[in-house]
Amino acid sequence: MSPCKVLMVAEKPSLADSLSRLLAPGGQYSTHKNTTPVHEWKGTFRNEPAEFHFTSVTGHVYGLDFTKEYNSWDIDPLKLFEAKTVKSESNPKMRLGHHLQSAAKGMDYLVLWLDCDREGENICFEVIENCLPYMKHPQHGGKMKNVLRAKFSAITKEDVRRAMNNLGVPNENEARAVDARQELDLKVGVAFTRFQTRFFQGKYGDLDSTVISYGPCQTPTLSFCVERHDRIQGFQPEPFWSVAATITKSDVPIKLSWLRERVFDRQIGTMFVNMVTDTKSAGAKVLRINVQKKSKSRPHALNTVEMLKHCSSGLGISPSECMSIAERLYTQGYISYPRTETSKYPENFDLNGVLREQSDHPEWGHFCKDLLTNGYERPSGGTDSGDHPPITPTSLAREGELGGDSWRLYDFIVRTFIGSISPGLKYTTTNVIFGIGNEEFECKGTKVTSPGFSSVMHWITKADEYIPDFKQGEVLPIASVNLTEGKTSPPDYLTEAELIGLMEHNGIGTDASIPTHINNICQRNYVQVSGAGRRLIPTNLGIVLIHGYRMCKKIDPELSLPTMRSDVEQQLNLIASGKAAHGDVLEYFLKMFAKKFAYFTKQIEAMDELFEASFSPLAATGRPLSKCGKCKRYMKYISLKPNRLHCATCDETYSLPLNGHIKLYKELRCPLDDFELVLYSTGSKGTGYPICPCCYNNPPFENFKKGNERH
């Protein structure tokens, strides 16, 4: 009997290679170059001789878009809510669909090794669509009988073998939830973006953004940043006064804090400082000494959100870059799957195995050996979200193997794992209360008695705050008494870490998509990242947009509130769990957003009043460059994104190619429309070619595509 043929598909070529090394006997297999490599070996499958073929895709096989007639920006955006959509290959040049079809010919089984999240489940069905028609059909049962799903959370021999021995079936409900989200985000995002972009870029020249985009997740994300900006701008600092006293013990000065903290009236502050000064000669008497033993609990197991927060605040790595590095470490087999909401180890999780793996590491091996020798209390806290186990190291790596940010992230993940099963941090606080006249002051000291997890998680270390020993009733000399003045200060701008926390709390995006939404508001020039703390400062454009949605009474404020997206995410979860129909959820939200869009377009003038107060009209922006072929007057070149030419006389705007330099081309004119040609080039050594602004925007011949009219 001939061996059965098994086709296996992973999400990335590197993952297919890593999995093949673990599955093939002795890690030996042959590789054939193709669109993506195909690894082959012989073994057994379900107790039968088998021939394995392992290949991959490169993420989504298909992308969702509108049908051809709706791709023009001249279409009424309101029609997009009911427009037909089509899935087309994400990368047509790769011809991944054809590759999968060829690979599936004559196969008996299809085993799907896509990432174990909703996006991965959606890609499973994209792969099935291409492979199933070309496979051998089973003699008994339906066509899907021999389509199997591998569930795994780490690229280790144990995890992969376990997945191979416990193959299940792909989850269509989760895939349909992704379909619903894709269609909703496409239609809502494109409709609002096209309308906003055309309206505002047709009127203002200094917006400095290629598109004025709207996104159901992106806009509430921006709204958090602008809300903090508004609090800062609206903050009114208030002066306050406090009494500061300094005592001495053994000739060492010790500063005391006033228990009243501060008052907001200078005269009252002066009264208190005079009262204390009058009794200065009597000294400061120790009234009470309060000693407390305290502890700081070890952290929960690491999930995606906490990893993103620390990368931004502690390592200075952006959320999108953090996820990119984490995915690479996962694919290389150094860490478990990095997209998870779970912060609790499963009951059967092999904590000892991970500790043993890391026990020979020169940086933290001794911590692991101590825990293995002396034992540890298994963690019980955290949240089990039912998706993937927490993020943990899966193999040992040294700095020389990884280097740079990859090492810094790996170092954090390993240390957090060790810290999560280490004892808590224990310390003692001493609070000494002094009486000076009728006023009370204090000084505080801290002493760490057992560093616990902070020994390995060094960034959490609590420093000792030394104070001398005091006795109750002891009287100490007062060196000085002063009235100090200060002002209340506003909150600071949001950090990326704080924004991630707000997004998680309000249900904006998922652990996988949060980095994308933050990156989008940066790329759109709505916020700028500032300083080592990675604080998000809204630009004028970002501020005006959110103010337009929220503050104009005629505009719908819900467009920028987190509650809208949170409602959408809840319904998508119901689709994923099989409790709601894909079509019903999609129809409900599309109708709702269509009504909001129609209302928004009718009231856009109210929002325009804010833009008018903040930005310059096209006619007042840019510099004269080339002559219009219609009125023969100079058009102004606007270099800010998107770069374009504007004729104030004709009130016409002409788009130009992006990411290059524009200058006048020898004062030559286009023979078709008499517009002066401009030269587009991509740098000092880049290729340059002349363009007619009119032909570039209005192709003169049917077979010419808009944006390709070189002269």
Where does each model-flagged region fall?
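Basic, low-complexity terminal or inter-domain segments flanking catalytic cores
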Residues: 3-7, 170, 197, 234, ...
